[in-house]
Amino acid sequence: MRFREQFLGGSAAMPGATLQRACRLLVAVCALHLGVTLVYYLSGRDLSRLPQLVGVSSTLQGGTNGAAASKQPPGEQRPRGARPPPPLGVSPKPRPGLDSSPGAASGPGLKSNLSSLPVPTTTGLLSLPACPEESPLLVGPMLIDFNIAVDLELLAKKNPEIKTGGRYSPKDCVSPHKVAIIIPFRNRQEHLKYWLYYLHPILQRQQLDYGIYVINQAGDTMFNRAKLLNIGFQEALKDYDYNCFVFSDVDLIPMDDRNAYRCFSQPRHISVAMDKFGFSLPYVQYFGGVSALSKQQFLAINGFPNNYWGWGGEDDDIFNRLVHKGMSISRPNAVVGRCRMIRHSRDKKNEPNPQRFDRIAHTKETMRFDGLNSLTYKVLDVQRYPLYTQITVDIGTPR
């Protein structure tokens, strides 16, 4: 009996002492675990190594390792070296050598400068679609009136999308037609006002990526339309990578915005039915007034001739060049291709060229050495107005 009491008394004391020591050990291990966890959290180290360092089984971790710790889906692990997510409302501290600023590139040797990074926007993330082949903005036949008063300042305010120098591109689509419109010019300010008044809205409705270049011949020597067009081609390419060139007289206005001021697979004659000629084509070879050539087509014929001083002949020479290079002329129908001409008397120093018929007869020979490869001129002034760019040039004198 005494033996039993001694045994029971001893056994009652032993479990209490043992449990107390076990609890102290468990508290110490938990404190160590908490301390190591805190240190690793603040330093951004990999928490997946904690069980190996503290020697605590996954059962004692209580699900703080792996996917459960970062709320990751089962089977996914945080990459080695990745920072654990901070508590809600707490911003992560930068890591020396890795984070130079919030949002910096996370990797050694990578530099970040927030001021140089583009700010993501809806338009920046989503690329614009290509403009449709036929613009939905066209209205068709239009009334052209040359008796209205035109104020260029007011016109510029009504067309805020036009950039300085007469540059425009659609804001809601990307146009494949990068068009430079070249106007040979001298002393036609009133005509230019009407041209800008009517053409800018038309070109915008056609959804073209375009620029307007007025090539102004300085001095009072004989006018040379074709040479000015060559100059316009070269000068426009200094501004932008145009792929199409429309060559337009300043006194011609289209009466239908379906008459496209752009390039096609073949050279395009745009002013096919002028009121001056009773809204009909004067002759099959006629290529004057307004025409369009792609960059490749223009280069293939060595540009336009430089030796047609005075009125007439150069458009027929251009037609011959195209035919000799195996090209054909594309035209709109006589309804869409209607144009109005601003009536005016013939300019001084633009009298008919008496040599034009002889020169036209020899186009096949002269086109090899008369054109872009023989073009000489001097730019005297460049003015970029709100609605157009004017380039004043000295083109020399007839030889």
From Swiss-Prot:
* GO CC terms: basolateral plasma membrane; brush border membrane; cell surface; desmosome; external side of plasma membrane; extracellular region; filopodium; Golgi apparatus
Q: Which cofactor does it need?
A: Mn(2+)
Q: Which reaction does it catalyse?
A: D-glucose + UDP-alpha-D-galactose = lactose + UDP + H(+); an N-acetyl-beta-D-glucosaminyl derivative + UDP-alpha-D-galactose = a beta-D-galactosyl-(1->4)-N-acetyl-beta-D-glucosaminyl derivative + UDP + H(+); N-acetyl-D-glucosamine + UDP-alpha-D-galactose = beta-D-galactosyl-(1->4)-N-acetyl-D-glucosamine + UDP + H(+); a beta-D-GlcNAc-(1->3)-beta-D-Gal-(1->4)-beta-D-Glc-(1<->1)-Cer(d18:1(4E)) + UDP-alpha-D-galactose = a neolactoside nLc4Cer(d18:1(4E)) + UDP + H(+)
Q: Which residues bind Mn(2+)?
A: D251, H344
Keywords, in A-Z order: Cell membrane, Cell projection, Disulfide bond, Glycoprotein, Glycosyltransferase, Golgi apparatus, Lipid metabolism, Manganese, Membrane, Metal-binding, Secreted, Signal-anchor, Transferase, Transmembrane, Transmembrane helix
Q: In which pathway does it act?
A: Protein modification; protein glycosylation
What is the name listed in the Swiss-Prot or TrEMBL entry for this protein?
Answer: Beta-1,4-galactosyltransferase 1
Query: Gene name?
Result: B4galt1
